[in-house]
Amino acid sequence: MKAKQSKTPRALATGTKLTCADNTGARIVQIVSVFGYHGVRRRQPKMGLGDIATVTVKKGTPDMRKKLVRAVVIRQKKEMRRPNGLRVSFDDNAVVVVDEKNEPKGTEIKGPVAREVAERYPKLGSMATIIV
């Protein structure tokens, strides 16, 4: 896993509901905790593009519902600024379910994937149809 190329805003807090953009069976997920977050003074854990979180499946197939899974954020509504000055934002907040080795559990990704995520996770980049 490589480092992020640009500083992405952490716009997604715990409790946020996101769409799942792969074919694992999960449709709507909710953030439970963020990996690598060490807060102070009762601050809410937040995350952005390329961050990994533990999420619970709220809507989906019966075998996926009510399960805790790991997920990577591939799209977020909050715009981010790239080093060349370009500002990028997406229509929705979306994640992809991954395993302990940060490899995707599904076989396809619906919709675009941010370039920063594709560079950081090569398997996600190879599965994506559109990289923005």
UniProtKB/Swiss-Prot annotation:
SUPFAM superfamilies linked to this entry: Ribosomal protein L14
GO cellular-component term (any): cytosolic large ribosomal subunit
Family: Belongs to the universal ribosomal protein uL14 family.
InterPro entries named among the record's database cross-references: Ribosomal_uL14, Ribosomal_uL14_arc, Ribosomal_uL14_CS, Ribosomal_uL14_sf
Biological processes, Gene Ontology terms: translation
Keyword vocabulary terms for this entry: Ribonucleoprotein, Ribosomal protein, RNA-binding, rRNA-binding
Subunit structure as annotated in this protein's UniProt entry: Part of the 50S ribosomal subunit. Forms a cluster with proteins L3 and L24e, part of which may contact the 16S rRNA in 2 intersubunit bridges.
NCBIfam families: PRK08571.1 (NF006344), uL14_arch (TIGR03673)
Protein name: Large ribosomal subunit protein uL14
Its biological purpose: Binds to 23S rRNA. Forms part of two intersubunit bridges in the 70S ribosome.
MF term (GO), any: structural constituent of ribosome
